């Protein structure tokens, strides 16, 4: 299971070679090491950021690809490397195209460990805890309210998807050795709508300001595919409200364990 990568989109715009070296180059080294040691199965953490923007923001695994940042391009490149390697060897490979993970383990055994994460919910939590402003980056996208649209997938559902995918690897054949799956809820939620859900969950309004998109940002997308349900027997069970609740509930536990 290959989840390792640098993931900060604006940073990838500023430091593309670092991202290509780390995310692509290190993956090639991993695949060579696997081949030397007789390991022929891999589950890769890809990203829905590789999709081209659709007018309705709905995507399936067959939708057009057009990564909008060096980070997204690294995921795009690794997918093609895995496809080619699988067709040229005994490798069986699956790519899970994550949408936007949020939340923590509902039983609070683990959660976000970075003190100041760069993703949207992490920034909301920082603003909520510090009584500072939360910036909606980009409010002129062609969405229903101008803010970016996302498919917020709870990390617990994401973990369940990995278990289902690993079990599915046993069924992968040499005729179809590389497969991809969208891992999302199927519901598009705008950033402004997430702000509203956050305020409802905490009972406290955020001080919201509007700003331009970050370098590498895109309008967004959400999955309308049933492929994961049909082939993996998986579908999302938790909501963005669950993700907000669990992310906040994790904070005192993180403080006990990590001191921040």
What do the PLM-derived regions correspond to, one by one?
Residues 7-11, 33-41, 168:
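A short helix-coil junction within the Rossmann-fold of NAD(P)-dependent oxidoreductases
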Residues 1-22:
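NAD(P)H-binding glycine-rich loop region in Rossmannoid oxidoreductase-like domains
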Residues 17, 21-32, 36, 40-41, ...:
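Catalytic helix-loop patch of NAD(P)-dependent Rossmann-fold dehydrogenases
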Residues 1-3, 44, 182:
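Rossmann-fold scaffold of SDR-type NAD(P)-dependent oxidoreductases
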Residues 128-260:
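C-terminal substrate-binding subdomain of Rossmann-fold SDR/epimerase-dehydratase oxidoreductases
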Residues 38-42, 90-92, 132-133, 175-179:
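Active-site loop of short-chain dehydrogenase/reductase
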Residues 68, 100-117, 125-126, 140-156, ...:
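Glycine-rich "substrate-gating" loop/helix at the edge of Rossmann-like oxidoreductase active sites
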Residues 47:
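Residue(s) in the substrate-gating loop at a strand-loop-helix junction
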């Amino acid at each position: 299971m290959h989840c390792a990568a640098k993931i900060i989109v604006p940073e990838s715009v500023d430091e593309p070679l670092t991202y290509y070296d780390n995310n692509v180059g290190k993956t090639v080294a991993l695949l060579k090491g696997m081949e030397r040691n007789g390991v022929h199965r891999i589950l890769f953490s890809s990203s829905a950021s590789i999709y081209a923007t659709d007018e309705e923001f709905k995507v399936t695994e067959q939708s057009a690809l057009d990564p909008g940042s060096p980070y997204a391009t690294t995921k795009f490149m690794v997918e093609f490397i895995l496809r080619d390697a699988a067709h040229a060897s005994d490798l069986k490979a699956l790519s899970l195209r994550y949408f936007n993970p949020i939340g923590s383990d509902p039983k609070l055994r683990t959660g976000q460990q970075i003190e100041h994460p760069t993703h949207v919910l992490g920034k909301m939590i920082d603003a909520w805890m510090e009584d500072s402003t939360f910036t909606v980056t980009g409010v002129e996208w062609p969405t229903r309210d101008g803010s970016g649209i996302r498919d917020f997938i709870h990390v617990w559902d994401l973990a369940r998807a990995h278990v289902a995918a690993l079990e599915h690897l046993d069924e992968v054949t040499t005729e179809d050795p590389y497969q991809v799956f969208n891992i999302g809820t199927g519901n598009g939620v705008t950033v402004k709508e997430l702000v509203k859900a956050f305020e409802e969950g905490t009972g406290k309004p955020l001080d919201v300001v509007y700003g331009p998109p970050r370098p590498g940002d895109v309008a967004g997308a959400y999955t309308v595919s049933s492929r994961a349900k049909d082939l993996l027997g998986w579908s999302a069970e938790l909501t963005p409200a669950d993700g907000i609740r669990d992310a906040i509930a994790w904070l005192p536990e993180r403080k006990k364990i990590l001191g921040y």
